[in-house]
A protein has these predicted regions:
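N-terminal ligand-binding/catalytic initiation module
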Residues: 1-164
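Conserved active-site and cofactor/substrate-binding residues in soluble primary-metabolism enzymes
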Residues: 71-79, 115, 119, 123, ...
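A short glycine/serine-rich beta->alpha loop
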Residues: 162-170, 298-301
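Glycine-rich phosphate/diphosphate-binding loop of Rossmann-like nucleotide-binding domains
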Residues: 168-254
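Adenosine-phosphate binding glycine-rich loop
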Residues: 186, 274-325
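Alpha-helical segments flanking ligand/cofactor-binding loops in enzyme cores
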Residues: 214, 243, 265-268, 291-292
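Rossmann-fold NAD(P) dinucleotide-binding segment
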Residues: 245-249, 259-277
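Short, well-ordered coil/turn residues at beta-beta hairpins
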Residues: 255-256, 280
Length: 325
């Protein structure tokens, strides 16, 4: 997968065209962050591409579009860099041919329904076209299949890897990698793959978390607890909705929500008995100290570069069809 001269120029930091503004250089944290224009008030679009993409021109960036009401510009840029670096770890683990990248949309609106999604995706498409193959994207937090349809249309079905016009559902692919990681962990650590007597807490019941919870039930789990910011979403057949995932005992914590939720306080005060942390969330720990606390407590964490790799594996196949179309 090769990028073109335009993409290489941008990633190599020669003078950019007028479309992008560099807001962070790679010598700071190992990723370039570009700001792309958006024809919509209260919306800012950042693109973070890991250094490996311009260090190895045959590795274009890949990562989804995340939409959030960030507290500040710094929070949005930090998230973009962290997520791009995390995507590189996933791609490196499975040798997909991609490097890590992320599109992060900072919304000044707390209510995301105010956003003109088609206009936003048109702006994102302009940025992707300008990168000319240096970046491929798909769904992420608060973006959906309808958004991807807008993006496919605006890009001419280029640079979008979201399983559109196919039977592949990238959310199911991610959920499948979570389930596989859970079953592998249980078999390795408990002696067999029987999950019927284990208690699971699925934190976040969006597209991926809901699929994970339902699949755990289908595979024989009898104790699946579900928690979501929107209580209605946690009402999944044969599951038990809970109010506070961080205060409810379980054997398996399955993070499928926003990043950085496991803070030092959460890790230190999580109820006794937790054995494993395996989920879909990118960067579930707020910092290294939070992860270290879980480690000291004997909680086994399966890195998300393994447990949530389903979508990037699907992307690595889909990109061949996109490039040939």
């Amino acid at each position: 997968m090769k990028t073109t001269a335009t993409a290489n120029t941008i990633l190599g930091f020669a003078p950019l065209n007028d479309l992008f503004k560099i807001v962070e250089h790679p010598n700071e944290r190992g990723a370039i962050v570009l700001e792309a224009p958006v024809d919509q008030a209260g919306i800012t679009l950042y693109i973070a591409i890991d250094s490996d993409s311009y260090g190895h021109i045959e590795r274009p960036g890949n990562g989804g579009i995340r939409l959030l009401n960030y507290e500040s510009t710094k929070h949005a840029i930090d998230d973009a860099v962290r997520l791009a670096k995390g995507m590189t770890r996933k791609h490196d683990m499975f040798r997909t041919g991609f490097s890590g990248a992320k599109l992060v949309v900072k919304s000044d609106h707390k209510d995301l329904s105010f956003i003109d999604r088609k206009s936003l995706m048109t702006s994102a498409a302009s940025a992707l076209r300008a990168l000319e193959g240096g970046m491929y994207t798909g769904c992420d937090l608060n973006t959906c299949d309808i958004d991807m349809d807008y993006l496919v249309e605006a890009t001419g079905n280029r640079f979008v890897l979201a399983g559109r016009n196919s039977r592949v559902d990238t959310n199911v692919a991610t959920a499948s990698s979570v389930i596989g990681s859970i079953l592998g962990t249980v078999e390795a650590m408990e002696g067999d793959a029987d999950i019927s007597q284990l208690t699971f807490t699925v934190q976040g019941c969006g597209k991926v978390g809901t699929t994970v919870a339902k699949e755990l039930i289908r595979l024989g789990a009898k104790h699946v607890q579900t928690c979501d910011l929107y209580p209605e979403c946690a009402k999944i057949p044969k599951c038990t909705p809970i109010k506070d995932w961080a205060l409810t005992p379980c054997d398996f914590l399955v993070p499928c929500a926003n990043s950085l939720a496991i803070t030092e306080e959460v890790a230190a005060n999580f109820p006794e008995g937790i054995k494993y942390c395996v989920g879909a969330t990118n960067s579930p720990f707020a910092n290294e100290n939070a992860m270290s606390i879980f480690n000291r407590r004997g909680v086994m964490h399966i890195p998300e570069s393994i447990s949530s790799a389903g979508a990037i594996l699907a992307d690595s196949v889909e990109v061949r069809y996109v490039m040939l179309s």
